[in-house]
Every structure is written in structure tokens, then in C-alpha cells.
A protein has these predicted regions:
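Single conserved hydrophobic/aromatic residue that forms the stacking wall/gate
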Residues: 1-12
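Active-site glycine-centered loops adjacent to acidic/histidine catalytic or metal-binding residues
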Residues: 14-15, 179, 203
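Phosphate-binding beta-alpha-beta segment of Rossmann-like dinucleotide-binding domains, i.e.
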Residues: 15-68
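Glycine-rich Rossmann-fold phosphate-binding loop(s) that bind the pyrophosphate
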Residues: 74-75
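N-terminal Rossmann-fold NAD(P) dinucleotide-binding loop
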Residues: 78-79
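Rossmann-like adenosine-cofactor binding region
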Residues: 91, 98-191
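Adenosine-phosphate binding glycine-rich loop
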Residues: 187, 195-214
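NAD(P)-dependent dehydrogenase/reductase Rossmann-like domain
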Residues: 213-237
Length: 237
């Protein structure tokens, strides 16, 4: 890294978007489970107006209570996502280096393949490293239930996008909600752009007004502390 090579101090801006990213995880989950976007579009097309009943739906609607959510990583964002899931009455499982004794009783440990095979929803919260690159691949997608949902608000290259598109198009899994892709903006030939039941947002999980204000305030605080000779959040001391 340039900061290390030049012996410059580097300060991190941690946690500014934790709540916003967890919120986006559930924005995707709820959109998929309730088909919010689809039903709103159908109402505007007049399908509810022309329906004889007081209500109208044409896709399965899924309740989150008692569903199993598997979190790949349990850092700040993963843990915040877990708390929201617990609020919905979900069963929460996580791949984490923490021991059982370090976890609240509502969160249970699982290994990676077990998460993929047993959970109804998988949400990715791990850093991108050589070990986690394309950890979501054809082999692990084949472990998932046919009604399972994959959520990625972490890093695009955690997922082999062609393998995910193939799994969606063949019905091996039900749906995916992603806020990140392997290249951004996406190339026109990205297979997820045309994949069945793939909901994509343009890397906006972090970008709530509140999170961006928090980021600027942290950056200003870091700069002021550095100028005063007492830098904060230094990662390359």
C-alpha cells in the first residue's frame, strides 16, 4: 500500500455505514420475500383495479419468522444484521472466529458449507481476501435449498457471478439481492444483469444521507487530530 511504502500514517473510517448496510440487507430480503417492487408495478398497471377481490397477489409471499439466516462473517455489519434478524424472529447462524461463549445465545456457529446447505437466506459480511475470493461458487450454490436467497452487500468478487446466474436461471436457488458486483459500473455482459430473480442495487448500501454525514464528520475529526499531533484510528503505526 502507498501509505505503508511512504511511511505515511493511515487512519480508517470505521463503522460509519454499519446501520445503513444492515438496512440494505433487509431491503433486499423484504423486497424478495414480499415482492414489493413487482406488486407495486402491477398495481400501477391496473391489475388491482381490475381484480374482483379486495387484495391481489400473483407470487408467493414469504414470512421471515423462524427462517434460518446464515451470516458469512460476524463483524460490525454482520452483528447488526443479526440483531435485525432476531427482531424478525429468525434463527441466526454465523461463520465466525468467535467462540460459542463470546456469542449471544440467539446466534449459533456453523461452518461454511453447513450454512449454505441448511439456511434459507445467506448474507455475505466477510472481507475480500484470497481465501474468500469467489467463495460463492457452483459447488456451494449446489448445496443451497431451491427456495434459498443469497444477499451480497459485501464485495462483488466474493461471488462467481456466472455460477450465480446459472443457479438462478436453472432454479437451483430462488433469488439473489446484490449491492456490489465484480466490476463497477458493471460491464454490459455481466450475467447477473439478465439473470432470473436477481435484484441489483448500484452500490448504495453505504450511501444513506446519515452515513455520508457521519463519514465526513469522522474524516474531519481524523484530520483535526492528525494536525494536532494526536491522530485517531491509525492502522499503520
Amino acid at each position: 500500500h502507498t501509505a505503508y511504502r511512504r511511511q505515511r500514517q493511515m487512519c480508517i473510517r470505521d463503522r460509519y455505514s454499519t446501520a445503513s448496510v444492515a438496512q440494505m440487507v433487509f431491503a433486499h430480503i423484504l423486497n424478495i420475500c414480499q415482492q414489493v417492487q413487482h406488486h407495486s408495478e402491477e398495481v400501477h398497471k391496473g391489475r388491482w383495479t381490475n381484480n374482483k377481490d379486495f387484495c391481489f397477489w400473483d407470487t408467493p409471499l414469504i414470512e421471515l419468522r423462524d427462517k434460518k439466516i446464515g451470516l458469512v462473517g460476524l463483524g460490525n455489519t454482520g452483528y447488526t444484521t443479526a440483531r435485525v434478524a432476531i427482531g424478525f424472529g429468525m434463527q441466526v447462524y454465523a461463520l465466525t472466529s468467535k467462540s460459542h461463549f463470546q456469542l449471544p445465545p440467539e446466534i449459533k456457529k456453523m461452518d461454511l458449507d453447513q450454512l449454505f446447505s441448511e439456511c434459507d437466506i445467506i448474507s455475505l459480511h466477510c472481507p475480500l481476501t484470497p481465501e474468500t475470493h469467489e467463495l460463492v461458487n457452483a459447488r456451494r450454490l449446489a448445496l443451497m435449498k431451491p427456495n434459498a436467497i443469497l444477499i451480497n452487500t459485501g464485495r462483488g468478487p466474493l461471488v462467481n457471478e456466472q455460477d450465480l446466474a446459472d443457479a438462478l436461471n436453472s432454479g437451483k436457488i430462488y433469488a439473489a439481492g446484490v449491492d456490489v458486483l465484480s466490476s463497477e459500473p458493471p460491464r454490459a455482459d455481466n450475467p447477473l444483469l439478465t439473470a432470473k430473480n436477481c435484484y441489483i442495487t448500484p452500490h448504495i448500501a453505504w450511501a444513506s444521507t446519515e452515513a455520508r454525514e457521519r463519514l465526513m464528520n469522522i474524516a474531519i475529526s481524523n484530520l483535526q487530530a492528525y494536525i494536532s499531533g494526536t491522530p485517531e484510528n491509525v492502522v499503520n503505526k
